[in-house]
Regions:
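A cross-domain feature marking catalytic cores of carbohydrate-active enzymes
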Residues: 24-26, 48, 83-87, 127-129, ...
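Glycan-recognition patch characteristic of GH18 chitinases/ENGases
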Residues: 17-115, 213-214, 339-349, 370, ...
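Substrate-binding surface in catalytic domains of secreted glycosidases
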Residues: 53-66, 130-292
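Fungal secretory targeting signals
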Residues: 1-17
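Conserved, mostly hydrophobic/aromatic
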Residues: 44, 83, 125, 197, ...
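Structural recognition of alpha->loop->beta junctions
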Residues: 34-46, 100-123, 127-129, 184-204
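Secreted, short cysteine-rich peptides and small extracellular cysteine-rich domains stabilized by multiple disulfide
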Residues: 301-344
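Glycan-binding loop/region signatures in secreted carbohydrate-active enzymes
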Residues: 71, 85, 242-304, 335-393, ...
């Protein structure tokens, strides 16, 4: 017991100064910046390793999407490089690994070996979510995950023991309804084992909601932080989360969104089995989403289209949000990129341009929004101005230990959100001497 507490204390001391944690995901790597843009980032978290990798006595090797050596060169030599395990929709490996003492010991040992093999400085456990309400909530109801409420803190305790003085962080939900394992009773058991708590104070409305609202407003982000403080979280361990993307939702055409765009009704945003029905989504702040189409576009010959491919689809074909040419609704409806092909009806790109031009600031809720009445779309996103308010009204006021963002590769058009966070740290949460 003494050894475990001592190791935990060492790790906590290593993150005591105000910090900036940044996720780097494998799906947005085209224009990742170098050191001249990443000043102030203390923790770079490569995402993701699959949760199932660590349950075997002879585990499969984890293969990072970029070599850790190359990734380290993008940041200051003092930046700690971590790896995140899990992510949205990847919970099965955690459920299996946490179920009993033997499975927890095996999982933790394998994680420790993986960190050593790749030279990582720590691990982030991105379990969305212990106790239920994950992507699989229709296939695996919460009633079948009740045991995870008790095993989750034990799982973290085993990891703490196994990785020694390396950094252990967790990504935790932003929506109160997802706090199934995060209660006054369980909170202290969870937080004692970890060095950082990355609060996903974004996606605060999602496709399970039925009215519009801010996905990451100042007020609802503050509400989330207060919920964690209420269940025993040490503010020095909390990192306030920021999202480098805008979200859009299809509104009910019979609702009064013109008069009351905040709180107006949405259409059903999920299929009956809980899967995405394409009536909501996200748009990142990277060149492929935000920049005008290059003038020298060629016709696609390999089925790829969009900014990165520098190609448009042949006549009559649509360019999907993921950058592929096709003619079905999957390519031509919601998310269709009108700069790179034909769209049938809704063009997310065109709607977003209107949102950027005519967006409105909700000073009370602390978020930017826009209602596109022509397409019945509601947009919600963060701006540098509201990021500054979050530093003043949440990070400074609540004496939080730091901030985090998802993800670096999603802000590569102008780096406005990254720069706003760097400025916020300078203004409201200076580094310790």
């Amino acid at each position: 017991m003494f050894k475990r507490l001592a190791l935990g204390l060492l790790a906590v001391q290593s993150v005591a100064a105000t910090r900036f944690a940044m996720y780097i995901d494998e799906w947005h790597v085209t224009d990742l910046p170098s050191q001249n843009k990443t000043e102030g980032i203390d923790y770079a978290i490569m995402s993701f390793a699959a949760s199932k990798l660590f349950n075997s006595d002879s585990p499969e090797e984890y293969k990072p999407f970029e070599s850790p050596e190359t990734m380290r060169k993008r940041f200051s030599p003092d930046t700690k490089l971590m790896v995140a395990i899990g992510g949205w929709g990847d919970t099965a490996g955690f459920s299996e690994g946490a179920k009993d003492e033997a499975s927890r010991t095996r999982y933790a040992k394998n994680v420790a070996s993986m960190l050593d093999a790749h030279g990582f400085d720590g691990v982030d456990i991105d379990w969305e979510y212990p106790g239920g309400n994950g992507q699989d909530y229709k296939d695996t109801p919460n009633s079948k995950k009740v045991g995870e409420i008790e095993t989750y803190p034990l799982f973290l305790e085993a990891l703490r023991e196994a990785i020694g003085d390396k950094v252990l962080s967790i990504a935790v939900p932003g929506r109160k309804q997802d706090f199934i394992a995060f209660t006054k009773e369980q909170g202290p058991k969870i937080f004692k084992s970890v060095d950082m708590v990355n609060v996903m104070s974004y996606d605060l409305i999602n496709r399970r909601d039925n009215v519009t609202g801010h996905a990451s407003g100042v007020q609802n982000s503050l509400d989330t932080i207060n919920e964690y403080l209420a269940i025993g979280a040490d503010p020095a361990k909390l990192n306030l989360g920021f999202a480098y993307y805008a979200k859009w939702f299809t509104t009910d055409p019979d609702s009064d969104c013109d008069e009351n765009p905040l709180g107006c009704h949405l259409v059903k945003l999920e299929n009956d089995d809980g899967t995405d029905n394409g009536k909501s989504g996200a748009l990142t702040f990277e060149a492929s989403s935000a920049a005008a189409a290059p003038k020298d576009l060629k016709d696609s010959t390999d089925g790829l289209c969009g900014f990165g491919a520098k190609a448009k689809c042949p006549s009559g074909q649509c360019c999907s949000a993921s950058g592929y040419c096709g003619t079905t609704d999957e390519f031509c409806q919601a998310g269709c990129l009108s700069d790179y092909g034909t769209c049938k009806g809704l063009s997310i790109t065109d709607s977003w341009r209107k949102a950027q031009k005519d967006g409105k600031a909700d000073e009370k809720g602390g978020g930017q929004y826009y209602f596109d009445s022509e397409n019945n779309l509601f947009w919600t996103w963060d701006t540098p101005e509201f990021i500054a308010r979050k530093f003043k009204e949440i990070v400074a006021e609540k004496k939080l230990g730091g901030v985090m963002a998802w993800s670096l590769g999603e802000d590569t058009y102008k780096f406005e959100h990254l720069q706003a966070m760097q400025k916020g740290l300078e203004s409201h949460a200076p580094k310790a001497n």
